[in-house]
Amino acid sequence: MKNINYRVKKIIAKQFQINIKKISLNNNLKNDLKIDSLDFVELIMLLEEEFNIKLFDIEAEKIKKIKDIIPYIKKKKLKE
């Protein structure tokens, strides 16, 4: 799981030009990282590409923090 956490943080850091050391799994996507709905869609697409999964069933309204995304990725990876 640590590898997944790091990879998610790395993608966010690169895409949104944020120092990875300043990214915590507890960061609120909207309030802390200023990620809007368009950015969120882009983030999901990048995660799908990185992990070679589809996150079409992700419940966007339930995703508030970075750590909320991790279970979706883990669930999809376990199905492989």
From Swiss-Prot:
Biological source species: Buchnera aphidicola subsp. Cinara cedri (strain Cc)
Annotated function: Carrier of the growing fatty acid chain in fatty acid biosynthesis.
Chain positions with O-(pantetheine 4'-phosphoryl)serine modification: S37
UniProt protein name: Acyl carrier protein
Record PROSITE patterns: CARRIER
GO cellular component terms listed in the entry, alphabetical order: cytoplasm
Modification comment: 4'-phosphopantetheine is transferred from CoA to a specific serine of apo-ACP by AcpS. This modification is essential for activity because fatty acids are bound in thioester linkage to the sulfhydryl of the prosthetic group.
Similarity comment text for this entry: Belongs to the acyl carrier protein (ACP) family.
Domain of life: Bacteria
Residues annotated as domain Carrier: 2-77
This protein's pathway: Lipid metabolism; fatty acid biosynthesis
InterPro entries per the UniProt record, alphabetical: ACP (IPR003231), ACP-like_sf (IPR036736), PP-bd_ACP (IPR009081)
Annotated keywords: Cytoplasm, Fatty acid biosynthesis, Fatty acid metabolism, Lipid biosynthesis, Lipid metabolism, Phosphopantetheine, Phosphoprotein
Gene Ontology MF terms in the entry: acyl binding; acyl carrier activity
Keyword Cytoplasm listed: yes
Subcellular location: Cytoplasm
